[in-house]
Amino acid sequence: LEDLELVALNVLDEEGWDTFTSTYNSRFAKLIDTFPGTPSDEKAFESEKKMFETFKWGMAYVCPRGIGATAWTGSEKAQTQRLRRFYLLGQTLDGMRVWDIRRAVQSLRAIGGLGETKLWIQAHRDMAVDALYASIFEDGISRLDLHDMPVTHNGTVKDSASAAAPMLNVLKYLDLPQAAALAAQKTKLVIYAKDKAAWDWTSTTLKNLGKHKQLQLRDPVGTKDKP
């Protein structure tokens, strides 16, 4: 482990979990009894294998609560009731997922040989939001790669379906562009987004603080060559 140049912590949502299991199913399904019966993606596995052979990188994966092996079952009504219980505790599901990600970071640091290894975090969609908040409270994260991340918690906007998962009272103080600026004070932030203008507040603020190099706005993966 001491030879690794970096470790990338991948925070998985359900789509990410499906990709993970199909990639590694043919090699590790017998070792991990929580793998679903998804078809194996040999092409994806060979791509991962080539990456490991080329770079001294380690990959870690975490499913925050309610995802993958810990996904809750039951009717839609039962799922709604379960989410309401978090509110009774003064929390939301994704608020607690932020804590899960923080604990994953702390657990990686506790592994012998990884205490000082460069740490990246990668996440998509709502897990990108949760990873962003988690990074604000944890030190020693070198880089955040956030894909397809919502730009607001405000569910009353025109495209309300694209709003981020709720966090109690967060909009009293900030929204995601402000949270991104906070995170970029501590770690390099790479956001993959079609609408780069949505992050103008973040980029302008960081420029005014002399930290504009902390933020990169990139095209979504796989769209570079598309018209």
Q: What residue spans do the PLM features occupy?
A:
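Short, conserved active-site loop motifs that form the nucleotide-linked donor/cofactor pocket
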Residues: 57, 119, 142, 212-218
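C-terminal catalytic histidine-bearing segment of alpha/beta-hydrolase fold enzymes
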Residues: 171, 197-227
